[in-house]
Amino acid sequence: MTIRFVPDAQWFRSQKGNGVLAGSPLTYFGVTDAGSKILDAIESNADLPQNHSQLTDRLLATGAVHPAQSLEANSSDVTVVIPAFITDTQSHTNLENLIASLIGLAIVVVGDASPHPVHISGARVIRHDTNKGPAAARNTGIALVATKFVACVDADVSVTGEQLLTLAGYLADERVAMVAPRITSLNDKTFIGEFESLHSPLDLGSTPALVRPMSRVSYLPATVLVCNTNSLRTVGSFDESLRLGEDVDLVWRCTESGLWCRYVPAIECPHRARRSIRALLHQRFEYGSSAAALDHRHPHRASPLRAHALLLVAAMSILMGLLSVAVVFIALTILYFCWSLRSTKISMTSRTRLAWLGIVSTTKLLAQAIMRCWWPLFLLASLVSWRPGVMLTFSALVPSISGLMRFKPNHPIRYLLVRIISDMSYASGVWAGAIRTRSVRCLLPVITVRRSISH
């Protein structure tokens, strides 16, 4: 198969073509004339020149480019591990349907003390006498795997054997420890189904990525996670002491060990939505409660916000409604970025666009951090000053109304309420975890003062 790559969504060529600013975080690559031809080929999806590997390896390592496709792995090289907590006939039927879609692959089902009996043909079934959690269930199955690759698949997702083999094909590059597809949510025409199809925490979007903490895609859910078995065992598999966030922890340990993790949204696997608003809010709370434990293992990686100081001041001015102040800081930010990026030789238009995108992105991230972490503080502060109240109101309403206008849900009022309350539930979980671990570090932002673009 001809090797081809696709540029990252953040890709800015220099005016003379002898450099590119790309990836997440942004990295600048200065290239020779030969390197410029390689960049041209990547942009046009043409055959790559010979001796491209030195440059393309550097681009791959920073997420500036991504593999365009992969060859399917052999079915004999993949074992599927399914952690299962079966509670009723419907969840058992879902498991049977999942296994039927994986015919041709070795399958291990680990029943984690399921209250409903698990009777499955076409798979090896292991039973835990006590409920040990999904991390332990996966590890029990992984310990039995003798193949090169292992696919961890949750029982409430739909995925085919062909999709898993395609994902495993990305592991032909031994630097890649794991790869995950896009996890979409089944829209069953109920309100919950519709809401989850728009705002599922498992759906990481449509843009491929090299996964790293504090980047555009900073983690992978273990809903469907295809791994190099040796790499997985080298880093110690899943941490069984974590009932939540064990997949995030595993990805971060891999990246800290120098291994690559890839997100491949071209492959989509639908996931069943929660059955009620109460279950949805409980899920968000649980996810939030994992932040403190993750921060304990990976200091500052679970921060609610990472931002450049100048961008942050501009974003704060916008959310406070201080338009005249915001205009000044927006102008200063654009001037600063245009000046600091002068060595990249990208056009002034691209530099201005980058600065503007940074302002917009930071404003969105600040609003998200306020709602998903700091809203109790802003609520208390609003009793003393009206500015925090303005920021809290903007952070709650602007994203929700924007989503209402963009998606046009069938239940607009309920959509607005659940959109706001789900974020507040996540924040409540973050605070609960911080109190439980007696550490506030997971509540603190990471503010940088230097240019975050590397060369």
Where are these regions (language model features)?
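Glycine-rich, basic loop-to-helix element that forms the pyrophosphate-binding segment
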Residues: R127-V145, T207-S218, T223, R253
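Short, well-formed alpha-helical segments that are part of the catalytic scaffolds
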Residues: A84-I103
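Short aromatic/hydrophobic "clamp" motif used to bind/position activated sugar donors
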Residues: V150
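Acidic, low-complexity/disordered tracts enriched in E/D and polar residues
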Residues: M1-A41, A61
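Conserved donor NDP-sugar-binding/catalytic core segment of glycosyltransferases
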Residues: G161-E194, R272
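Catalytic donor/gating beta->alpha subdomain of glycosyltransferases that bind UDP-sugars
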Residues: L59, V248-H300, A331-G358
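Membrane-embedded multi-pass helical conduit in multi-pass membrane proteins
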Residues: A315-A432
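Short, flexible, basic/aromatic active-site loop/helix in glycosyltransferases
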Residues: P181, E196-V217
